[in-house]
């Protein structure tokens, strides 16, 4: 069962068709977070992002939350993880993020977009692509 608010009536529209994101979206989502974070970086006020980004599609645990933050997200949702594994994934993720921050003596604000600023795809060396042998030409 799914629900989406109708913008005209402002009432919920209920249906049985629901799409669920998942961990398979993590690399793609991190890529686009980094791209958008970099594009918006010049549009800041007092060093704070004018448009905070939310990482969605793929966060399963605290490590994934950290990956989203490093890619440029200011917040991360974990709806698919909660649906599949229950709300306990949230407290475990929070603990993992807290432990990571403490072990590196840093704060969340210092992580946001840090990986997006390191290297762009155009700057990466051309890698061997062993998977190409499995693709029809």
Sequence positions of predicted segments:
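Glycine/Thr-rich beta-alpha phosphate-binding loop at enzyme active sites
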Residues: 1-46
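Glycine-rich phosphate-binding active-site loops on the catalytic face of alpha/beta enzymes
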Residues: 1-2, 58-59, 64-92
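Glycine- and other small-residue-rich loops at beta-strand/loop junctions that grip anionic moieties
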Residues: 21-25, 54-58, 79-81
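Electropositive phosphate-/nucleotide-binding environments in soluble metabolic enzymes
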Residues: 23-30, 87, 91, 105
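Extended, intrinsically disordered, low-complexity segments
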Residues: 26, 43, 95-137
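Generic structural signal for well-ordered alpha-helices
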Residues: 30-37, 65, 90-94
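Hydrophobic faces of well-ordered beta-strands that scaffold small-molecule active sites
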Residues: 36, 52-57, 76-78, 107
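Glycine-rich beta-to-alpha transition loops that act as phosphate-gripper elements at the mouths
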Residues: 46-63
């Amino acid at each position: 069962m799914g629900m989406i608010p109708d913008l005209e009536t402002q009432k919920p529209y209920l249906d049985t068709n629901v799409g669920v994101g998942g961990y398979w979206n993590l690399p793609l989502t991190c890529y686009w977070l980094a791209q958008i974070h970099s594009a918006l970086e010049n549009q800041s006020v007092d060093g704070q992002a004018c448009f905070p980004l939310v990482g969605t599609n793929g966060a399963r645990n605290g490590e994934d939350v950290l990956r989203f933050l490093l890619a440029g997200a200011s917040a991360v949702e974990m709806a698919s993880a909660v649906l599949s594994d229950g709300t306990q994934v949230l407290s475990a993720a929070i603990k993992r993020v807290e432990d990571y921050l403490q072990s590196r003596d840093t704060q969340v604000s210092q992580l946001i977009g840090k990986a997006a600023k390191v290297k762009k795809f155009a700057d990466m060396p051309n890698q061997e692509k062993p998977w190409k042998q499995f693709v029809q030409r």
